[in-house]
Amino acid sequence: MTTFETPRETVFIESVDSIPQSKKTHVFAICVTVDNKPIVAARRSSFVFQEITMNMNPPIVVTISKHLTNYMYNNEIKEIKRKLQKGSAPIYKTSFEELILLGGKLNKSETIDDCIRREIKEETDSKLTIKSIGTTCVKITITDKLFNRKYVNYCKLCYIDELMEEVISFVIYNVEIRKLKSLLDCDNNDKFNYLRFIYNTLLYSK
């Protein structure tokens, strides 16, 4: 097991022989282009903003930690600022981007690979053509330090027919995904080191 610490997450990564076939299972994929480059996605909204807005009751924010704004998009910060009461702490702009892997929760009637195929189709507006899905897998256990939440996910590689140049040019209208990106271009992101480790582990364990 390998551990990564970021300012907002503690991440445990371990190779596993199989993925539980359960409706509680969350499975994701790092897609690999035909020119051998790994793909991640940028989320339309940040997890921090989602958490804050889901728990606004009443829907007025009295104050918000500057630390939380480091993990929000600028349009979200403006929205929160609009709801802030007079005299609350200032909010600063960030260059934040919420990276995620493509995938999601397993349906009862699906296999693991069926779930990956369905989620990738939905999240990319059917833009990616899947050739094959790898057989090796890793278990990813994430503790969110900001909200004290724990998540258990699984990940595989998914090989596609498109070149990276094509992938990054796609316009995505999915409600959750704003665009697809090369993981290798995201080295300034707080998730980069552990996402790259996951990719390399899956790639060289095949």
Swiss-Prot record:
The active site is at E119 (nucleophile). Induction: Expressed in the early phase of the viral replicative cycle. Disulfide bonds: none annotated. A motif (Nudix box) lies at residues 104-125. The keyword Lipid biosynthesis does not apply. Its EC number is 3.1.3.-. PROSITE patterns: NUDIX, NUDIX_BOX. Residues 23-206 form the Nudix hydrolase domain. GO terms for molecular function: hydrolase activity; metal ion binding. InterPro entries: NUDIX_hydrolase-like_dom_sf (IPR015797), NUDIX_hydrolase_dom (IPR000086), Viral_VD9 (IPR003300). It holds the Pfam family NUDIX. Belongs to the Nudix hydrolase family. Decapping enzyme required for the removal of the 5'-end m7GpppN cap tethered to viral and host mRNAs to allow their decay in cells. May therefore accelerate viral and cellular mRNA turnover to eliminate competing host mRNAs and allow stage-specific synthesis of viral proteins. Acceleration of the turnover of cellular transcripts may even promote the shutoff of host protein synthesis. Does not cleave unmethylated RNAs or RNAs shorter than 24 nucleotides. This is mRNA-decapping protein D9. It comes from Rabbit fibroma virus (strain Kasza).
